[in-house]
A protein has these predicted regions:
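Helical hairpin unit composed of two closely spaced alpha helices linked by a short loop
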Residues: 350-363
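N-terminal localization/anchoring segments of enzymes in phospholipid and broader phosphate metabolism
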Residues: 1-336, 340
């Protein structure tokens, strides 16, 4: 019996070696012609396939695939007033009827129109913006706004640590849930894993309290992640459709500057009060619908702007991009802004891996 197994294995191995060249050619054609990638990326994958046959293609299937064509979140789900607002604003721009309060924004009309066409991003100019660069200040503001929630709280983070900061947030969420406030938490499967991350017992405790929880891209087998480069890094909080938070701070003690390894954590988060919050509400619902298998677009109350919104005069256009986008709206916005620069360009980022297009624009 064992001799037969060894013979089958040897035969299969020899067949694989004999056909290795043909298999690599087929895989190479798949990489070149079935995925749109820049030449540098294509060459990198082809070299990997050449030096590590077959295994290289398996790595490509896990790390290199472009899932954009799958349209995971399908923007066509956005109906009603949002679609109408996009079309109406496009007409205003085409007919030069759009009046911007800030004359400086006149030269950005082409960019505004691009964002409308590509990302259905409506421009609103009745917003009040607050900027936070300190984690403690940001989370104090978030906790305060959640404590004043009347109808719903939606929060979405890539990383949530089960530590003292989360305990502060959880305490408010549990209290608001008892008061009848509808609460949804969306977390990324990979970002919340690990020894310091959230565990099943943590989520179960929230669910028992009536809080809805959804996991983005859950692991297939235990900790196996097949889409490691398609994580949800968004950090969004929307309260009553009235106020929204978006930016770079995740939930963890290190973001408060309490981790010796990282020291003081400098990041940027903004708080929006005004009509632009609707765009954040839509973005959350798109991600939630995909992760939870629901259709919250049927619930108009999640997108209605409350009468008690204070608002302001700041113009805002929320640009959203990711594996669900057919084009790279955020990247293209940076490129266009760089090309439009007249005096100076300042870039501040912890992750600077410019592609060919960005390097050409900077030159």
């Amino acid at each position: 019996m064992s001799d037969n197994i060894l013979e089958i294995f040897a035969t299969s191995y020899m067949w694989l070696l004999e056909h290795m060249f043909l298999i690599n050619v087929v895989f190479s054609f798949l990489i070149i012609f079935f995925q749109r990638k820049n030449p540098t990326t294509v060459w990198a994958w082809l070299l990997l396939l050449y030096f590590i046959p077959i295994l290289g293609f398996l790595l490509y299937m896990i790390l290199g695939q472009n899932f954009r064509k799958e349209r995971m979140f399908k923007m066509k789900e956005i109906e009603g007033e949002i679609k109408y607002a996009v079309r109406r604003q496009e007409e205003s721009i085409y007919r030069k009827k759009l009046r911007l309060r800030d004359p400086e924004l006149e030269r950005f009309k082409s960019l505004i129109l691009y964002n409308l066409n590509e990302g259905e991003a409506v421009l609103t100019d009745n917003n009040d913006i607050r900027i936070y660069t300190d984690g403690r200040e940001k989370f104090n503001a978030l906790l305060n706004e959640m404590d004043h929630a009347r109808n719903y709280i939606h929060i979405q983070y890539y990383i949530i640590r089960s530590d003292e900061l989360w305990k502060e947030i959880e305490e408010v969420l549990l209290r608001k849930a008892r008061q009848g406030v509808e609460i949804r938490i969306l977390f990324d499967s990979m970002g919340c894993r690990g020894r310091k991350g959230m565990h099943k017992a943590d989520w179960d405790r929230l669910r028992k309290a009536g809080i809805q929880v959804a996991e983005f891209f859950p692991a297939v087998l235990g900790k196996l992640q097949l889409r490691v480069n398609y994580r949800n890094h968004r950090k969004i909080a929307v309260i009553d459709g009235r106020i929204g938070f978006v930016g770079g701070f995740n939930v963890g003690r290190e973001y408060l500057g309490k981790d010796r390894k990282f020291g003081y954590w400098r990041d940027t988060h903004i708080c929006i009060e005004g009509s632009a919050v609707t765009s954040l509400a839509v973005r959350f619902v798109l991600d939630w619908n995909y992760a939870a298998g629901e259709n919250l677009f049927l619930e108009d109350r999640l997108f209605a702007l409350p009468e008690y919104v204070r608002g302001g005069k700041d113009p805002v256009q929320i640009i959203s991009s990711g594996p669900d986008s057919s084009s790279q709206e955020i990247r293209d916005n940076y490129l266009r802004l760089i090309h439009m620069a007249q005096r100076s360009i300042y870039i501040q980022t912890p992750y600077f891996v410019p592609d060919e297009g960005l390097m050409t624009a900077l030159k």
